[in-house]
């Protein structure tokens, strides 16, 4: 009835024009003031650029390149204002993903403002299954989606093209970027003892054989197999200075055990006599005095 009596659809009142042009909007007295409850600036949404008032504009400036909602703005703690690189507008589809739901597949906050994404929607299609066969079978961590094969494409040409409702298989090998770490070929280990591929040093046959040979020689040394009354580990440590002379003359290699110096050639550094180590010197702790008298 109002349209029949007084049709004003073609008229524009001054108040409407003032609202569109934002007439009477007072600039902000301070920079960085909170504008979270203010309306959206019409000029920036219309032109896609900053309005004439700039950062002093009392309205919010929303840009299209901001696709994620600012988590600090949700709590009223964002200090960047219009200079923030995130979106200052509550949009559930543009919210960041909930950490607890993505990590533990559960979020106990009934009013959680963050986005809950189903883990099944994150699973990518298996590139090998698309090609025709996946050796992992049902244990593959990628999604195996069954599709009906397009017989026209298999014959050589499909008139529907990409809009075909049936599956167009790809016979080329999937690129490395689409493969997971478990689908890549594992690098063979290298033995640090013999340098061969396929095994590690702890399972190397050459290393095990040389280790057994070394243990047999050590057992013979401890049982008194060498003449001269060699006294085991303690004598070996004390006579290390005298055995350094034979260190460079003896060859080294896998499975080689250095033969200790005979006791007759050992020189006691306390008294200067041969035939015993310093820890078994018969002159005791004052043996260095007799060593000084002998030099005089």
UniProtKB/Swiss-Prot annotation:
Region (Disordered): 222-254
Function summary: Component of the cleavage and polyadenylation specificity factor (CPSF) complex that plays a key role in pre-mRNA 3'-end formation, recognizing the AAUAAA signal sequence and interacting with poly(A) polymerase and other factors to bring about cleavage and poly(A) addition. Has endonuclease activity. Binds RNA polymers with a preference for G- and/or C-rich clusters. Binds single-stranded DNA non-specifically.
Protein name in UniProt: Cleavage and polyadenylation specificity factor subunit 4
ZnF C3H1-type span: 35-63, 64-91, 92-119, 120-147, 149-171
Root EC class: hydrolase
Family annotation (PROSITE patterns): ZF_C3H1, ZF_CCHC
Domains as described in the record: The N-terminal region containing the five C3H1-type zinc fingers is essential for endonuclease activity.
Keyword Repeat: yes
InterPro entries: CPSF4/Yth1, Znf_CCCH, Znf_CCCH_sf, Znf_CCHC, Znf_CCHC_sf
């Amino acid at each position: 009835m109002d349209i029949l009596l007084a049709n004003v659809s073609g008229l524009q009142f001054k108040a409407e024009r003032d609202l569109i042009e934002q007439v009477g909007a007072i600039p902000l007295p301070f920079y960085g003031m909170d504008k979270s409850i203010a309306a959206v600036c019409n000029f920036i949404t219309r032109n896609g650029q900053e309005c004439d008032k700039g950062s002093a504009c009392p309205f919010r400036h929303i840009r299209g390149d901001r696709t994620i909602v600012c988590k600090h703005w949700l709590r009223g703690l964002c200090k960047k204002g219009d200079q923030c690189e995130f979106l200052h507008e509550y949009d559930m589809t543009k919210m960041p993903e909930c950490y607890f739901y993505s990590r533990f597949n559960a979020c106990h906050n009934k009013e959680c403002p963050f986005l809950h994404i189903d883990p099944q929607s994150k699973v990518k299609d298996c590139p090998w299954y698309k090609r025709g066969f996946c050796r992992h079978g049902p244990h593959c961590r990628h999604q195996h989606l069954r599709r009906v094969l397009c017989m026209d494409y298999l014959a050589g040409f499909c008139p529907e093209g990409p809009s075909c409702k049936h599956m167009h298989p790809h016979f080329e090998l999937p690129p490395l970027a689409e493969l997971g770490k478990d689908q890549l070929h594992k690098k063979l280990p290298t033995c640090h003892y013999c340098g061969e591929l396929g095994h590690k040093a702890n399972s190397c046959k050459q290393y095990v054989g040389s280790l057994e040979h070394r243990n047999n020689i050590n057992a013979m040394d401890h049982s008194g197999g060498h003449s001269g009354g060699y006294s085991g580990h303690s004598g070996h440590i004390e006579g290390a200075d005298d055995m350094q002379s034979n260190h460079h003359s003896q060859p080294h290699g896998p499975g080689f055990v250095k033969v200790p110096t005979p006791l007759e050639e050992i020189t006691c550094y306390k008294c200067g006599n041969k035939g015993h180590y310093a820890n078994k010197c018969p002159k005791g702790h004052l043996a260095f005095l007799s060593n000084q008298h002998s030099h005089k």
